[in-house]
A protein has these predicted regions:
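Alpha/beta-hydrolase fold nucleophile elbow
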Residues: 117-129
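Catalytic active-site module of serine/aspartate enzymes centered on a nucleophile-bearing elbow/loop
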Residues: 252, 256, 260-288
């Protein structure tokens, strides 16, 4: 297998320096010296996820071994601490919003284009899981220049809480979300609810799907226990004719069999990786 090299750093929003975005870049060995640049893929986790969760390091490694550069990030509202593996920043999680996710993607993209040593801006792609899938679709549609999108188990809307929950959330000033993996109870404040209600048009995932010019692959498990297959089907139906493909993996769950800590690739994850990397290779050719 080809070797890879990694770089980790933190970006801060200029107008809100308390909002930190942790970034991990992984490319082929010596990628920084490649003449003409290499394709870059922005990778975004989902809700309660992070860039070192489960399959993400393996996904990053596979991208790099394929001759591309993976740019993974923890959103400023992920709640992940300095150790990059613990959801210890409760205040950041409390103030998370979908719009902040989009701003984080913009911040990383801007840094990449202005400071990346070997970025070929004609060969950019995005890859997101779950909530991250919906966010990268919104981001890609707005930017308009991504050559490929990969959405794993994507949400099709941001209004994910029922009316009763939203009313109680507004009344109590927060909603509590259990973390089945860690046993933590995460609190989310009104910023997220305000964002959902005030920025509905900007956060319209299906509307963005209908407008996107980016070739889009959707991979979804038929037994996804977190996001229904109907979400993927509705996104696929909204995409302009011929611009999207839906790959349904029979019996696969939301994380394609992956756990945290990572225990290796099973059949479902291998299938998801194979079809996704093929999509990238077709739309981000290694030679112009």
């Amino acid at each position: 297998m080809a070797g890879t090299q990694q770089t980790n750093f933190v970006l801060r929003h200029p107008r809100a320096p308390e909002r930190r975005v942790q970034v991990r870049i992984e490319g082929p060995e010596g990628y920084e010296d490649v003449d003409g640049g290499l394709p870059h893929v922005l990778v975004l986790h989902g809700f309660k996820g992070f860039m070192h969760w489960g399959f993400f390091p393996e996904l990053s490694r596979r991208i790099a071994q394929g001759g591309m550069v993976a740019v993974s990030l923890n959103t400023s509202g992920s709640g992940v601490g300095d150790d990059l593996k613990t959801l210890s920043e409760e205040e950041a999680f409390f103030r998370c919003t979908f719009s902040h996710d989009l701003e984080d993607l913009d911040l990383v993209r801007q840094h990449l284009l202005e400071n990346g040593p070997c970025v070929d801006r004609t060969r950019l792609a995005v890859w997101g899981h779950s909530r991250g899938g919906g966010m990268v679709l919104l981001h890609a549609e707005r930017c308009g220049d991504y050559k490929a999108s990969v959405l794993w188990g994507p949400i099709n809307r941001v209004k994910i809480f029922d009316e009763e929950t939203r009313l109680r959330w507004r009344e109590e000033g927060e909603v509590q979300i259990p973390n089945g993996r860690t046993g933590q109870i995460h609190r989310i404040g009104l910023d997220l609810l305000d964002d959902i209600e005030e920025n509905a048009a900007r956060l319209d995932i299906l509307g963005a799907a209908a407008r996107t010019l980016t070739p889009t692959l959707i991979v979804h498990g038929s037994a996804d226990e977190a996001v229904p297959l109907s979400d993927a089907e509705s996104i696929h139906a909204a995409l302009p004719q011929g611009s999207g493909k839906l790959c349904v993996l029979p019996g696969a769950g939301h994380t394609f069999g992956a756990k945290h800590p990572f225990e290796g690739c099973g059949e479902d994850l291998e299938a998801a990786l194979e079809v996704s990397l093929d999509h990238l290779q077709r739309h981000l050719p290694l030679s112009n």
